[in-house]
């Protein structure tokens, strides 16, 4: 039997040993069991309910310069919601023309240089849904009759007609297409403008003009096709997009619109020959071609230049040496005391395509003298058209200048390009042998411009290129505004807007520009924008 003393002694001994040895943690074995019930499945359903709010529809009814607005609020529509759809009913004018000689096709000789170019400035992305019924465009006007298809009201106006020979053209202005009746397409040029300002177009915009009112969109790409039908597509949907580059500020805007056109027919206006512009430019572009593309006779050319001289214009720009122009244009110009900006037109064949023209020019100068020439222009927008490289053009300018100098010509030489060509290729003005910089700025192709701002646009382009090229010696070798064609941004072609634009250009540039052109050039195809034939302005000068 253990005595109490022995038990206590043993307990104390164990306590001592326990305190002396380390205490190890208890080992635990944890088993993780993944369970999935096979008999009790619970599924959580998550749902989102979106409230659909129908906004009112705003309807614009445009008649000439008057716009009627109606807000449509059918049953179930929230009258306080923002409208998202605009229906614009455009009531355009109907015009007919009777002429003594109107060609049935648009002809363009392969040797005839195009004197008009076009470019794109800040691009606009637009989705267009257009419903059109029997819409066509024809050139020339003898009487304007505005018919309101949706009402019983009719309005007519009868300006004095000017008889012209034209080619029929059908233009879908809403979607930027041109359906042209004829077999030949013009060399429509597209280039980018170094615009100094931008325009943000808002959704559901309608613009009314004096001649024709259209709710249209900026075409950034378009197609040209032959057509003999007077009506165009119905319920046509088109979406176009384009990107442009410029070292100046640029803007891209998008807009959507829905346009409904009913029984609309428009025409290019040609009103009375009474002066509407208060002053004349120092120079005007002239082409010695008949409306069908054939060459004018010496008598016809002499009559044209006599008219130009009577308007107080002392210089003309001629784009090429074809049509036997050295025997028709030059003699008439010498007789009338008109100076010529003689062009050497570079074609798609490259810079060597002007070699024969250079030879002909030298032969004329050595025989008749050089006094009739104001200056010589080597190429017109050849860089922009992609018909030659900058280095090739620079070399050709040097070669031509050397040959002309050896032949006795001591005048100036230049080339003519849209402003963006010099902006993208400053060597063309900084490292070439041109005596001044020639630019072709056109406000129509800048969607942020308009007829009212055409003058400031042209002046801004001159100042821009002065900075790019490091010289103040920049001259406007071609500019103008169309009287007919497709709306491009803030630019609405019409006779009234053409007069406004040209007057503003002359005011801003102190008359020192070359205006395109003497007559409407019906020998050209209308081009993608439907404007190429309608730059003629001689009748509006005093």
Curated annotation (Swiss-Prot):
Instruction: Give me the stretches of Polar residues compositional bias.
Output: 138-149, 182-208
Could you say which residues form the signal peptide?
A: 1-20
The record's active-site residues are: 478 (nucleophile)
Give the subcellular location.
Secreted, Cell wall
Q: Which GO terms describe its biological process?
A: carbohydrate metabolic process; cell wall organization
Q: Which UniProt keywords apply?
A: Cell wall, Cell wall biogenesis/degradation, Glycosidase, Hydrolase, Secreted, Signal
Purpose? Involved in cell separation.
Q: Where is this region: Disordered?
A: 98-119, 138-169, 182-276
EC numbers, comma separated = 3.2.1.-
Instruction: Return the Gene3D superfamilies for the record.
Output: Glycosidases
Major location (coarse): secreted
Spell out the note in the miscellaneous section.
Present with 22600 molecules/cell in log phase SD medium.
Query: Key word Transferase present in the record?
Result: no
Q: Which gene encodes it?
A: SCW11
- The main enzyme category here is hydrolase
Give the protein's recorded name.
Answer: Probable family 17 glucosidase SCW11
Cite the record's Low complexity compositional bias ranges: 98-118, 150-168, 209-276
Question: What organism does the record attribute this protein to?
Answer: Saccharomyces cerevisiae (strain ATCC 204508 / S288c)
The UniProt GO MF terms for this protein read: glucan endo-1,3-beta-D-glucosidase activity
Q: GO CC terms for this protein?
A: cell periphery; cell surface; extracellular region; fungal-type cell wall
Please tell me whether the keyword Ribosomal protein is annotated for this protein.
no
Family (UniProt): Belongs to the glycosyl hydrolase 17 family.
């Amino acid at each position: 039997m253990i005595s109490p003393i022995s038990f206590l002694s043993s307990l104390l001994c164990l306590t001592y040993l326990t305190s002396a040895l380390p205490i190890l943690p208890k080992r635990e074995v944890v088993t993780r069991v993944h369970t999935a019930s096979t008999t009790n499945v619970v599924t959580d359903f998550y749902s989102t309910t979106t409230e659909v709010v129908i906004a009112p529809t705003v309807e614009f009814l445009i008649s000439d310069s008057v716009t009627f607005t109606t807000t449509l609020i059918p049953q179930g529509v929230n009258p306080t919601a923002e409208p998202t759809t605009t229906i614009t009913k455009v009531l355009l004018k109907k015009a007919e023309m009777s002429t003594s000689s109107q060609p049935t096709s648009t002809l363009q000789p392969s040797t005839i240089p195009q004197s008009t170019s076009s470019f794109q400035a800040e691009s606009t992305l637009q989705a267009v849904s257009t419903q059109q019924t029997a819409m066509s465009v024809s050139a020339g006007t003898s009487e304007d009759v505005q018919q309101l298809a949706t009402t019983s009201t009719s309005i007519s106006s009868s300006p004095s007609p000017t008889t012209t020979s034209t080619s029929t053209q059908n233009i879908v202005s809403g979607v930027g297409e041109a359906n042209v009746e004829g077999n030949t397409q013009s060399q429509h040029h597209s280039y980018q403008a170094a615009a100094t300002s931008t325009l943000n177009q808002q959704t559901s915009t309608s613009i009314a003009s004096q001649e024709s009112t259209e709710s249209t969109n900026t075409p950034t790409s378009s197609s040209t096709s032959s057509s003999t039908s007077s009506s165009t597509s119905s319920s046509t949907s088109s979406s176009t997009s384009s990107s442009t580059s410029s070292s100046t500020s640029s803007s891209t805007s998008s807009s959507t619109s829905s346009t409904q056109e009913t029984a609309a027919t428009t025409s290019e206006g040609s009103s009375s020959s009474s002066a509407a512009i208060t002053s004349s430019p120092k120079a005007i572009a002239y082409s010695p071609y008949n409306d069908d593309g054939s060459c004018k006779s010496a008598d016809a050319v002499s009559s044209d230049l006599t008219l130009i001289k009577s308007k107080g214009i002392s210089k003309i720009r001629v784009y090429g040496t074809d049509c036997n122009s050295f025997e028709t244009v030059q003699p008439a110009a010498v007789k009338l005391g008109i100076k010529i900006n003689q062009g050497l037109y570079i074609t798609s064949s490259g810079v060597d395509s002007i070699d024969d023209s250079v030879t002909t020019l030298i032969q004329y100068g050595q025989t008749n003298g050089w006094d009739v020439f104001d200056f010589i222009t080597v190429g017109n927008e050849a860089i922009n058209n992609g018909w030659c490289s900058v280095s090739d053009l620079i070399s050709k300018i040097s070669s031509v200048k050397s040959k002309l100098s050896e032949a006795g010509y001591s005048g100036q030489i230049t080339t003519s390009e849209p402003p963006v060509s010099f902006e993208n290729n400053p060597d063309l003005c900084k490292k070439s042998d041109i005596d001044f910089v020639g630019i072709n700025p056109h406000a129509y192709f800048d969607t942020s411009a308009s007829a009212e701002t055409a003058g400031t646009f042209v002046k801004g382009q001159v100042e821009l290129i002065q900075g790019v090229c490091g010289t103040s010696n920049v001259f406007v070798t071609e500019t103008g505004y169309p009287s007919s064609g497709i709306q491009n941004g803030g630019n609405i072609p019409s006779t009234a807007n053409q007069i406004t634009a040209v007057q503003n250009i002359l005011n801003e540039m102190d008359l020192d520009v070359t205006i395109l052109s003497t007559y409407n050039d019906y020998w050209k195809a209308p081009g993608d924008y439907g404007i190429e034939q309608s730059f003629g302005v001689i009748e509006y000068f005093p």
